[in-house]
Amino acid sequence: MSGPHPSVAAARNAVRALLAELEPARGVLVACSGGADSLALAAATAFVAPRAGRAAGAVVVDHALQAGSAEVAARAADQCRGLGLEARVVRVDVDIALGGPEGAARAARYAALEAASREAGDAVVLLGHTLDDQAETVLLRLARGSGARSLAGMPRRRGVFARPFLHLERARLREVVDAVGLTPWEDPTNAVDGPARRADGGPLPRSAIRGRVLPALTEALGPGVPASLARSADLLREDADALDAFAADLLSTARGEDGSLDVEILAAAPPAVRRRALRRAALDAGSPAGDLAHVHVEALDALVTGYHGQAGVDLPGGRRAVRACGRLTL
């Protein structure tokens, strides 16, 4: 008797490895859009989780941004139930004025998934992001001038979220759904000429990278480009983790009992470590991470290394940094 299709086996092994990292009694929820990647994840989880003694279910988020979205969500939930997963649909309201259509939909989706995790007893939410998604993320952030932490791409685990498929190609997951007889939904917003557009009429950034940039790079450099970009993300994540640890040590050394920072200690540190420490200090002081930009960190750094009596620095969240008597107070 032959075994499962090689791609089915690879998907199951990826989920099995992820589940082995979790606390023994912790359940999992598959975030399923109805697309090929998340349906493959649902199929692999439905097979592996019961055999690992774990409760497993599925959550389908309906963003209600496209005509027929309720039907798409219902069909995805039905396919999850057919695999043996208890599934439910959660409809969210997306304010596209907040961060554009992609960002607003993402924020609403993750908030709904976090709520579903809490309702399921802090279940881990499994996301179907692939090696190709990781490559697209690296390119997108590189084009925006991001630093090492952002270029490290999507982490395998963060908070309640986990991504077991980050080292599997999208094409292999398409083979999974074909092999197990599932019918994926083709999201029109993923297409370069899809209905969702930027304000200037151009394609959404990720759609452009998926449909134009990565294919052009692959044609010019060969088929290994996505894997190479994903590998770069892994290497950068190790570097970023080390720099973050050094920055935490620097903050601990520089911080006084009143919370102010010793400027001399900060100035003696390598710039990459010092700027990370200053960013962390601003976050600790209450500046929202999403609003704290490179320009703010540069201004804080100037208070340390280029001080000539200038005024303090206004930070997001109504915070302010000032230098006095060799100390930096946020």
Curated annotation (Swiss-Prot):
Catalysed reaction equations from the record: cytidine(34) in tRNA(Ile2) + L-lysine + ATP = lysidine(34) in tRNA(Ile2) + AMP + diphosphate + H(+)
Species, as recorded: Beutenbergia cavernae (strain ATCC BAA-8 / DSM 12333 / CCUG 43141 / JCM 11478 / NBRC 16432 / NCIMB 13614 / HKI 0122)
Localization, UniProt: Cytoplasm
Domain remarks: The N-terminal region contains the highly conserved SGGXDS motif, predicted to be a P-loop motif involved in ATP binding.
Domain of life: Bacteria
GO molecular function terms attached to this record: ATP binding; tRNA(Ile)-lysidine synthase activity
Official protein name in the record: tRNA(Ile)-lysidine synthase
Family to which the UniProt record says this protein belongs: Belongs to the tRNA(Ile)-lysidine synthase family.
Major localisation: cytoplasm
EC code(s) of this entry: 6.3.4.19
UniProt cross-references to Gene3D superfamilies, sorted A to Z: 1.20.59.20, HUPs
One Pfam family per UniProt: ATP_bind_3
Function: Ligates lysine onto the cytidine present at position 34 of the AUA codon-specific tRNA(Ile) that contains the anticodon CAU, in an ATP-dependent manner. Cytidine is converted to lysidine, thus changing the amino acid specificity of the tRNA from methionine to isoleucine.
Chaperone is among the record's keywords: no
Residues that hold ATP according to the record: 33-38
One annotated GO biological process: tRNA modification
A GO cellular component entry from the record: cytoplasm
Keywords assigned: ATP-binding, Cytoplasm, Ligase, Nucleotide-binding, tRNA processing
